[in-house]
Amino acid sequence: MGHFDFERFNGFARQSLDDLLFSDLWDYDIFNERDMHSSAYFYIRDYFRKHERDSAYVRCEPQLAGMRPDIVIYERGRPTYVLEFKFFSKPDYINEDAIYDDLDKLADCVDAYDSIKWGFFHLIYDAEIPFTLSDSRLRRAGFSKISVTSINARRKEGTDRRRNNYDEWRGEFDKMQELHRKHA
């Protein structure tokens, strides 16, 4: 089992988890924030299972520092990572107040527990104009030890190119989401 490799998990949380969540979105497995939590929970548990980390466990919405973060990862009973998720399915809509509420929650958890190494915030949205929060912007706003990754369903991060087959995907996504609404 060996020593826990925090840097490896940080890389997973910042890159691989983001890619996996995008795949689930694009494959019509994520339609709302709860679906996003469920997918992330599965992939995080699978990550620890593959790395034989019996002392690490994952919980959804536990009570922590008077709040309920979406996901908390514990190592030997101590909170080590906290994760928050936001999902905005409506095109060209982002609620920045809701984003900053979650960032505040992460910051409060990080401040309350010395054992917490990082807080991770994952955002899925669909917009023509990319929404980003750089590490330097986060630090200036007082958010240290917090990483933000975002998935724009319409445009690729970095290149800002429109995704191939976006219009077809969006049409199907809207159709399927409308069908699900009667069961919500």
Model region roles, listed by residue range:
Residues G2-D5, F9, N95-A98:
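Residue-level preference for long, well-ordered alpha-helices that form the structural scaffold
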Residues D5-R59:
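Acidic-basic catalytic patches of nuclease active cores, encompassing PD-(D/E)XK
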Residues L25-D29, F87-I94:
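Surface-exposed cleft-lining segments at the edges of enzyme active sites
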Residues H37, P91-D92, E128-T132:
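Short catalytic/ligand-binding loop motif for oxyanion handling, primarily in non-cytosolic enzymes
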Residues R53-Y81:
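Active-site metal-binding core of divalent-cation-utilizing nuclease and nuclease-like domains
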Residues V110-L138:
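Nucleic-acid nuclease catalytic cores
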